[in-house]
Amino acid sequence: MKIIAFLGSPRKEGNTELLLKETIRGIKDSGFSVQIFNLNSMNIQPCQDCGGCDDTGECIYHDDMDVIYNAIRNTDRIILATPIFFFSVSAQTKLMIDRCQCFWCEKYLLKKPLQPGELGRKGLLLLVGGMKKDIGVQCSEACATAFFRTISIQEHSTLSFLGI
């Protein structure tokens, strides 16, 4: 089983990273490996909404997203770990999600959705927030759900840790 994880926190060794590491430790204890993408340290340009991916499903800009695109295409499980900033996912996480517009075009315009593979594609959303209110979870969940559906993940779980 292929598993990838996106770390969307700008804080090195922050709460989001610590929780992701614990999650990955459990996965490794089960005999699987995880490819981690630290979004804060990657060279990812923002989506320009240029329409360049409309006809091909491929982004015309080439940066570290090229590696992410390949990983998303070939994975069975995706972990999206992000702090909650201003009631949503972090800027680093949103930047990566926005650049997945090419998958949206591929799925909805070109009618070529990513295939679920033998194991099916599943996701996990890990959220960490300082506030104790659920509004940040709800807004982050909406963003993550749109992302997961775009990349053919129909089933995902959410773990949220608030007030830390």
Predicted regions and their residues:
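Short, histidine-centered active-site or binding-site loop motifs used for metal coordination
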Residues: 7, 127-130, 162-163
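Glycine-rich phosphate/pyrophosphate-binding loop and the adjoining helix
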Residues: 1, 24, 29-30, 134-164
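Short, glycine-/small-residue-rich phosphate/pyrophosphate-handling segment
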Residues: 108-154
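N-terminal beta1-alpha1-beta2 submodule of the flavodoxin-like/Rossmannoid cofactor-binding fold
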Residues: 1-105, 110-113, 159
